Every structure is written in structure tokens, then in C-alpha cells.
Amino acid sequence: MKTLYSLRRFYHVETLFNGTLALAGRDQETTGFAWWAGNARLINLSGKLLGAHVAHAGLIVFWAGAMNLFEVAHFVPEKPMYEQGLILLPHLATLGWGVGPGGEVIDTFPYFVSGVLHLISSAVLGFGGIYHALLGPETLEESFPFFGYVWKDRNKMTTILGIHLILLGLGAFLLVFKALYFGGVYDTWAPGGGDVRKITNLTLSPSIIFGYLLKSPFGGEGWIVSVDDLEDIIGGHVWLGSICILGGIWHILTKPFAWARRALVWSGEAYLSYSLGALSVFGFIACCFVWFNNTAYPSEFYGPTGPEASQAQAFTFLVRDQRLGANVGSAQGPTGLGKYLMRSPTGEVIFGGETMRFWDLRAPWLEPLRGPNGLDLSRLKKDIQPWQERRSAEYMTHAPLGSLNSVGGVATEINAVNYVSPRSWLATSHFVLGFFFFVGHLWHAGRARAAAAGFEKGIDRDFEPVLSMTPLN
């Protein structure tokens, strides 16, 4: 395909360190990018870029399969998943595979199957990636026009966007079908401490589903992260899947409007920046979800949330001291507030002491003890079940506060287990990756806008120090 603009003008700041490492058609002379600039060399080689993306997908799926089998091989059924540093098996368990009442693992075979399926898929993707990177056509426009594209062809780009949206919508519906028809999913709120169940009564009311989007993101409200029943989660996926599929069909059938053609930058690097920006938002949302939400991420598999561990500690000591004869309704703490129970600013009865700041926690082991005005004193005296005591004692000693070089758990809890919670791993990694992707979004957006405006300068290549240095080889 003929290059429609000057490489010198657009691709200006790359220096070749070692000319012998480049392949024909992918060297600095023909692309303006050196080998270490990676896929930038393939901007105008749609066939080779396809190979790079398929191979990348193969690496991702290979990691999923290999890590899945690694976790299965190391899994000890007697210990909770969160004590074993697992991050993939909890996701499979949440989808209802291999678990029974209370989140107990009763069968690891589905986990093995998942790992093997991903390994086999990765082999297919790996072969396709190598084929398209080395053997397939360099460009797809001539032989396979449906799969070919020019980056500034606005109509083709929105068609590709539409196809992606439809695939995302189908992905959302996979979860819906699993929850409705294929065995159900794990519900941490099922009576008696959680169980796998089919979701029958979906929440489809737009006022409820979109009400989450209108909530404040701060404490007590918690935006979409505050979702706490599976009917809403699965109903939300019905809405999201439908919107994605309908939006995909819309983008395939229509051309961009004039305002969009004017407002957006239409180049490969611009699309990269848009994608990185979206992934950054996903990363930050996932961080908050796995840290605070114990419905989408059940504590049976991921360990308690921070607020949950704190409230569990207060509950455990209330149970202990009540057995020893304390009147938990009236006992006074060192500050003059209630030692075990007090009132929140809005009048609910809540746990006293330091855990008062987590008074809006909702957890399946605690909710049965609440009445219309918060914690119910008569229920606390008569209705506490052994499973609630066991679970809160377990969560009290497994706060998600450990770090790689510290002792895990709450500093004031002498029985804390020294471990790093999967919530810590997943929240931290997604926050850090979200931040890096945001920086990448800014970087590529800046470059794309500069190239579109035609004012980027780069460095004067004629008098660059590296030109007078001896080659690396």
C-alpha cells in the first residue's frame, strides 16, 4: 500500500541502534521506526499487525491457562483460597464452578478443564500469530478487503468499532446465560452462608440499574461499586450487553456524523490513545470493585474487605464478652461512647469503637442481625448463629492489610494471619496498571494531536551525538 504521508514528518524521534537486526519491510528506512519501537513498525502493514495482535492474545490466554493449572496444582482444599495467594480460582468459584454451600470447594476438576481449554486455545492463537507475523500477507487490503483498513478511513473504523462492541455485548450475555441457565453463580447472600444458585428474578428496571450510575462515588453511596445483590449484577449485564450489541449494529450501519469527523483525530495512534484511556478507567473501577465489593467478589474466595475485617473484630469481641456476662447494650468504652454498640450520625445502632468508621458495611454474616434501626439488640442477644461466629472470627484474623515485607492483618489483632490478601494484590495491581495506562493515554493522545496538527518537530538528526558513536555490533 502506498504511504500517503511523509515518514520523515510523522515519525521523527526514533533512532536505530543496530541496523542489522531489522527485517525487510520492517526496518527504520522503510517505516521510520527502529526494531525496539515494536508494533509501530507495522502501522501500515495490516497483515503483520494482525499477527502481532493474535500472538499477543495467545500470550494472554497462555498465561491464563498456565497460571490456572499452577493454582490447581498448588491448591489445598482445607485452606481458604485467599490464604493461598490464588487470583484465578476465586474467579472460577464465583462463577459457580466446583463449589457448594458456604463456598466450600467440592470438585477441582472444572478448574483443571478451564486451564487445559485455555492452553489449547493459546496454541491455536500462537500458531495464528506466528503464521500472520511471518508467512501471511503483509497487507490485507488487496486479498481480504473485509479485513483490510486504512487508519483514516472513518467509515471503516466505526465498522470495526461496531464489531468490537457486538463481541463485548456477547461476552456480557455469556455471564447472563451462565447465571440463568448453566448452573447459576455463587451467591454470597444465600441463606446460611452462601451457595450456588440460578438467578431467576432479574432486575431489569432502568431506574434501579441506571440509578447506580447517578449515585455519589463516596462513602455510603459508592456509585456502581455499591451493588449488593446478584439480581442487579446480572440484570446490569443484560442492559450492558444489549446496549453494546445495539450500539455495535448502529456503528456498523452508520457513518460518523460531521461533528465527530471534526472533533476526533482519525489515526492509528489516536485510536491507541482512546483505547488506553478506556482501559485506564476500567482499571480504576476494577480496583475499587475488588477492594470494597463483597458480592461480585465474595469474601469466601477473596477474603474479607478491610471494613468487613474490622467489623468482624468488633462482632467477635461482642460475642465473647456477652458470653462472659457483659451487657453489650449499655457498656461504656474508654471515650464515653458505647464500648460495643453506639449510634451512627443518622441514628442507626452500629458497632462501637474504632470500627465505627465502617458502620455502613454490609456483609452476609452480619445482615441477619439488623433490624429497621440498625443492629437489633434482641437479635444480638438471642439469634447469633455458630456459622456467623466462625466466619467473623476467620475474617477478623484475615484483614487485607498485609504487604510483601510486613506482617499481615490488623496491627491491634494478635491472632492475625500473616498473608497478603488477593484483594490487596488485585486492587493494587489494577490501580497501578490503570495509572500507567492513563499516562500512556496522555502520551499517545499528545503525539496523535501533534501529528494531526502538523507541528511536531522531533530532534535534528544531522548533529545527534549517537551518530558519531561506534555501532553496538
Curated annotation (Swiss-Prot):
Propeptide: 1-14
One MF term in the entry's GO annotations: chlorophyll binding
Subcellular location(s) per record: Plastid, Chloroplast thylakoid membrane
Gene Ontology CC annotation, any one: chloroplast thylakoid membrane
Residue ranges of the TM segments: 69-93, 134-155, 178-200, 255-275, 291-312, 447-471
Keyword set, alphabetical order: Acetylation, Chlorophyll, Chloroplast, Chromophore, Manganese, Membrane, Metal-binding, Phosphoprotein, Photosynthesis, Photosystem II, Plastid, Thylakoid, Transmembrane, Transmembrane helix
Binding of [CaMn4O5] cluster, residues: E367
One Pfam match: PSII
Sequence positions bearing Phosphothreonine: T15
Main location, first listed in the record: plastid
Keyword Phosphoprotein appears in the UniProt entry: yes
Cofactor note: Binds multiple chlorophylls and provides some of the ligands for the Ca-4Mn-5O cluster of the oxygen-evolving complex. It may also provide a ligand for a Cl- that is required for oxygen evolution. PSII binds additional chlorophylls, carotenoids and specific lipids.
Biological process, per Gene Ontology: photosynthetic electron transport in photosystem II
SUPFAM superfamilies referenced in this protein's UniProt entry, alphabetically: Photosystem II antenna protein-like (SSF161077)
Family stated for the protein in its record: Belongs to the PsbB/PsbC family. PsbC subfamily.
Listed NCBIfam families: psbC
Subunit structure: PSII is composed of 1 copy each of membrane proteins PsbA, PsbB, PsbC, PsbD, PsbE, PsbF, PsbH, PsbI, PsbJ, PsbK, PsbL, PsbM, PsbT, PsbX, PsbY, PsbZ, Psb30/Ycf12, at least 3 peripheral proteins of the oxygen-evolving complex and a large number of cofactors. It forms dimeric complexes.
Function according to Swiss-Prot or TrEMBL: One of the components of the core complex of photosystem II (PSII). It binds chlorophyll and helps catalyze the primary light-induced photochemical processes of PSII. PSII is a light-driven water:plastoquinone oxidoreductase, using light energy to abstract electrons from H(2)O, generating O(2) and a proton gradient subsequently used for ATP formation.
Name used for this protein in its record: Photosystem II CP43 reaction center protein
Native organism taxonomy: Eukaryota, Viridiplantae, Streptophyta, Embryophyta, Tracheophyta
